[in-house]
Amino acid sequence: MGAVTYPDEKVIEIIEKYMVPIQVLFDSQPLAARFNIQWTPTVITLDEEGKEHHRTIGFLAPEEFIPSLMLGMAKCHFDREKFSKAIPMLEDILKNHPKSEAAPEAVYVRGVALYKSTHKADFLKEILKRLQAEYPSSEWTKRAKPYSLL
């Protein structure tokens, strides 16, 4: 990723704007053990307290890496119930990276965030509907199937 992804201008911009990157070799102790790093590259999104919210393993090109980073940041906010911060990031993924591997999960997490912030079950139904229409073979579509019972 050092030759292709990390030097990308858009990748640099998002990292400089939102993140504090640290690079750890997969066999560097004690961090490799603490974060269960088994292969490289492993990219982990942590919050300021060191709690993990998102992880990718293996090479990602810039067009996949950027939405993955954004999803990680959104999940940091989501996990701390800061839905008003998570939702715009998830919507940005869906608007600007709709074909990315992160997009189906962004649909799912966005819908759950909307539900948790409003308690309106229609948002859960919308998750399944959108996933079936736009990402029918995604694992996130399968995970949303129970929402058809609402």
Label the model's feature ranges.
Residues 51, 55-61, 93-103, 118, ...:
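Short solvent-exposed coil/turn linkers within tandem alpha-helical repeat scaffolds
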Residues 78, 111-115, 149-150:
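Specific register positions within alpha-helical solenoid repeats of the TPR/Sel1-like families, i.e.
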Residues 89, 126-127:
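Alpha-helical solenoid repeat scaffolds, predominantly canonical TPR units
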Residues 86, 123-124:
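Single-residue signature of alpha-solenoid repeat helices
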Residues 33, 66-100, 116, 134:
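Alpha-helical segment of the N-proximal tetratricopeptide repeat
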